[in-house]
Amino acid sequence: MTAPNESGAITIIMPRTALQRWRSLTQVGFFALFVLAPPLDIFRYDLTIGNFILFGHHWTLNLDALQHGQATATEAAVNVLLFGLLPILLIVVGFLVVAWRWGRIYCGWFCPHFSVVEIINRLMQRAIGKPSLWEQERLPEAQADGSVLRRNRWYLVPTMLAVVGFALLWSVSLLTYLLPPFEIYSNILHGELTRNQALFLLAATTAFCIEFLLARHLFCRFGCAVGLFQSLAWMANRRAMVISFNRQRGSACRSCNNACDNACPMRLQPRTIKRKMFTLSLIHI
């Protein structure tokens, strides 16, 4: 695809690669799963009944049977091992093995929080020329794919709508992981939220608004335990997948506007000492 630039010259716009399209699909799919898992009873914890619900079935340790004398201590211990510790251990080990080999692939390909980070980055860059309020300088309008992203102050409106909208969506979604989803939806639609439900939504929405607007990158880099353990597992593997320098295309860096630094949604600087990153966001920029 081609498009004229400011001087009238034709600029080649690189189409998205198959890998980039797959990444977008996995992000959208996992975000939808994050929102829809509670109402579809795929996974949630119901405080009203005191146990998890997994794929429509109650997932319990069956300790009530021990309290009522209907099971022995040995049977209760086996239930705790098989239905409590073992599934958690398998999930944790599997997650760390994937991170050991492919780095923070969950962050870049699945994490619903990081999907919001990228959307707000893009909107904020359109509004003020920077993907973060803390960025010192505006980024070049010329993008790595050859397109031009022009600044427009009117994009502050959709940026703020996205911040508030995603904050509210996250708050409601988290509440449905703890209480019956359709009860929450009904209470919101009819204005019948209980005091505790209203306080939770108000506090969570406010916190997410602040985080999405001011500290979304800081949370991912320093506050997310899931990201931290992925990084630790990845650093333990000397042969893990990394982003490295392609010497055959080294001459392209002479006319480059630091595209890899500008494209990084986490505001890292791959051209510095942290050049071997452990996500795939910079592939084919």
Where are these regions (language model features)?
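Long, internal scaffold/assembly segments composed of regular secondary structure
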Residues: N257, D261-A263, R267-L282
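Membrane-embedded alpha-helical bundles of multi-pass integral membrane proteins
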Residues: T2-G250, D261, F278-L282
